[in-house]
Amino acid sequence: MTSEAPRVKNKNPAPIQISAEQLLREAVERQDVAFVPPKINITDLEELQEFQGRKRKEFEDAIRRNRLAMGHWMRYGQWELDQKEFARARSVFERALDVDSTYIPLWLKYIECEMKNRNINHARNLFDRAVTQLPRVDKLWYKYVYMEEMLGNITGCRQVFERWLKWEPDENCWMSYIRMERRYHENERARGIYERFVVVHPEVTNWLRWARFEEECGNAANVRQVYLAAIDALGQEFLNERFFIAFAKFEIRQKEYERARTIFKYAIDFMPRSKSMELYKEYTHFEKQFGDHLGVESTVLDKRRLQYEKLLKDSPYDYDTWLDLLKLEESAGDINTIRETYEKAIAKVPEVVEKNAWRRYVYIWLNYCLFEEIDVKDVDRARKVYQEALKLIPHKKFTFAKLWLMYAMFELRQRKIDVARKTLGRALGMCPKPKLFRGYIEFEDAIKQFDRCRILYEKWILYDPEACAPWLGYAALETKLGDSDRARALYNLAVNQPILETPELVWKAYIDFEFEEMEYGKARSIYQQLLRTAPHVKVWISFANFEIAHLEDDDEEPPNEEVASPTAVVRARNVFENALAHLRQQGLKEERVVLLEAWKQFEAMHGTEDTRKHVSSLMPQVVKKRRRLEDGSFEEYLDYLFPDTATDQGDKMRKMLELSRKWKEEMAKKKLEA
């Protein structure tokens, strides 16, 4: 089949059979012209007032037709806000709340509008009304406390949390309150919340959270009191092996081995054996490490140490063995021995300057840094280890983003943000890798420095404009910040790039963005732009699904929520028809079959009997054909014979298939009669 459709001189219909071309031509000629709303130019105040009155009448009519459609109310209120008619906007939202005060998006939209216009007291009053009427809706409470915290009103934030806790919400609320107090280093308040928390939700997990909190605060006596209080409060019915294992491991970390042994023995006597298999395993492991037979255990450790040292003598650059030896020494707990082992391990610098040969070696450095920071709590020594590791790596050949990022996060934990920034900036200057860009951006995003995030995204795009990750990440950041125009501009720049690694991801994200913004016309334009550059059958099908998935303002209202709008169905059907015409013109048979199958499913859900028959009439017949190969042999293959194939050979093939089908039906009837 040629790439272009043959030019038909005689456009009159055939006396017997009507061609597909004639059907399409008549369909186009009879097609109604789409309504294009006139462009309005407002020149004076009187015209503006007349326009506003007309729009208000349209909104009021839409509300009268379906007063329960909250989308009309929200669009009405938003329009009034766009006109700077704040009193009218509030009136619209209040009327909507009178209709349905349980519709959460309406409350959020109302509050968001007040916050955007910096009417904080109005927003606070609305939150009070919302949580009073809907105290079981957690989203309203979360938004409320988030607003108060962002405003710096920590006292008000606590008051909101206390109001919320009176309703005894789920665990996430309590943990959010605790995390808020910990962010402001109010550990005593957090401790008081935990005391109330375990009364309302006395699960083992919550007691363990409290114990972990006390351990992080560095008060071992309080941790023990929490565990003992949990034993008294929960009793045998609710305690499990995980609780006792956590208690014992805490005592092990405190080097209180006799206490840990007592806990294990008590738990074994307390818990039934069927529910304490992991407890027995941990106790056995504990006794092997810290049991009474210290000589035996020491012999076992020495034996394993000798085995590792022998292996390292034969293969001094076997870094997996070094890691096993270091793990063994860390389990022994001798800090000086552990340091000596680390120094011996890092002295074995790989002889080959290749990244794969350095990977496991760098892990030794990372473990060394974590050991000094976490186990020994020697911050200065940990910093020195990080710096020595960075000096050693040949950055001109390769680098390890994980090391740079861990060092930056280490400095952040020490509250040296400038040093962390300089470290990451130095890393990007020496070796700009995507992982470093991503880590640096996450670092700035974590401390809410969004302008710096923008600068980093711009540098990333300049460095690698063909990569999709910086474009998508930048646009997602602007979307998160609520700047839709900047996000849209970024997506537009991305799709217009001459070369992209995976452009389909950018197109999909762009379309999803416009769909979430309810800018359906812009999303449609993006689909049309994509089809001009990549007219793939999947894009056509996605375009049709998009048309049926949304309801525009001028669309005909569906009879119920389960049925699509007739106007949307017509739009989607037009997309399928255009796609079929394009694929027919390009001579893409398999793609036409895929499209027709999707169209058939669409008509099965949204079409009528006539439209289903029409699509079925377009389905091809599968025929077997033979073709000659280069070596002179033949092979069979499947081909598609479409009803609109305008060739003599196709007509003969269809007639032959029709005769074959009739013969089979006659033979089947004869068998039944016999």
UniProtKB/Swiss-Prot annotation:
Coiled coil: none annotated. One of its GO terms (cellular component) is post-mRNA release spliceosomal complex. The keyword Acyltransferase does not apply. SUPFAM superfamilies: TPR-like. SMART domains: HAT (SM00386). GO terms for biological process: mRNA cis splicing, via spliceosome; mRNA splicing, via spliceosome; spliceosomal complex assembly. It is found in: Nucleus. It comes from the Eukaryota. The keyword Amino-acid biosynthesis does not apply. HAT repeats lie at residues 50-82, 84-116, 118-150, 152-183, 185-216, 218-253, 255-289, 299-331, 333-367, 377-413, 415-446, 448-480, 482-516, 518-549, 567-608, 610-643. Keywords: mRNA processing, mRNA splicing, Nucleus, Repeat, Spliceosome. Belongs to the 40S cdc5-associated complex (or cwf complex), a spliceosome sub-complex reminiscent of a late-stage spliceosome composed of the U2, U5 and U6 snRNAs and at least brr2, cdc5, cwf2/prp3, cwf3/syf1, cwf4/syf3, cwf5/ecm2, spp42/cwf6, cwf7/spf27, cwf8, cwf9, cwf10, cwf11, cwf12, prp45/cwf13, cwf14, cwf15, cwf16, cwf17, cwf18, cwf19, cwf20, cwf21, cwf22, cwf23, cwf24, cwf25, cwf26, cyp7/cwf27, cwf28, cwf29/ist3, lea1, msl1, prp5/cwf1, prp10, prp12/sap130, prp17, prp22, sap61, sap62, sap114, sap145, slu7, smb1, smd1, smd3, smf1, smg1 and syf2. Belongs to the crooked-neck family. Involved in pre-mRNA splicing and cell cycle progression. Required for the spliceosome assembly and initiation of the DNA replication. This is Pre-mRNA-splicing factor cwf4. It comes from Schizosaccharomyces pombe (strain 972 / ATCC 24843) (Fission yeast). The lineage of its organism: Eukaryota, Fungi, Dikarya, Ascomycota, Taphrinomycotina.
